[in-house]
């Protein structure tokens, strides 16, 4: 299943499961606006790109992998985090960009 399809299906399933929070994390000056975020299972993070360059946000944390692929300036993408874990989020274009997402009840 493609990443985008998983995001859409996950979002639809989570919409009926109760109230979920959405945290917005901006990308500007080749860094994330937040270096650490704590959310609950089912919550989402919307990654916005306010930078003048493209980004490629991803995680290879086992069981919580995702990849947004090339995100052009002014684009936004939402990722659902369905289960508990500590997720390292990076940008493959700018290796110094890093944030930690802690998903816990």
Language-model features, listed with the residues they occupy:
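N-terminal secretory signal peptides that target proteins for export/translocation
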Residues: 1-3
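Extracytoplasmic copper-binding redox domains, predominantly the cupredoxin/blue-copper superfamily
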Residues: 5, 11, 16-105
């Amino acid at each position: 299943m493609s990443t985008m399809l998983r995001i859409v299906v996950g979002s639809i399933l989570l919409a009926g499961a109760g109230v979920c929070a959405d945290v917005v994390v901006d990308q500007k000056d080749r860094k994330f606006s937040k270096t650490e975020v704590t959310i609950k299972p089912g919550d989402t993070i919307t990654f916005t790109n306010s930078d003048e360059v493209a980004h490629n946000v991803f995680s290879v944390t086992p069981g919580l992998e995702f990849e947004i692929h090339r995100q052009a300036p002014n684009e936004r993408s939402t990722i659902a985090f369905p289960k508990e874990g500590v997720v390292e989020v990076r940008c493959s274009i700018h290796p110094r960009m890093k944030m930690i997402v802690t998903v816990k009840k």
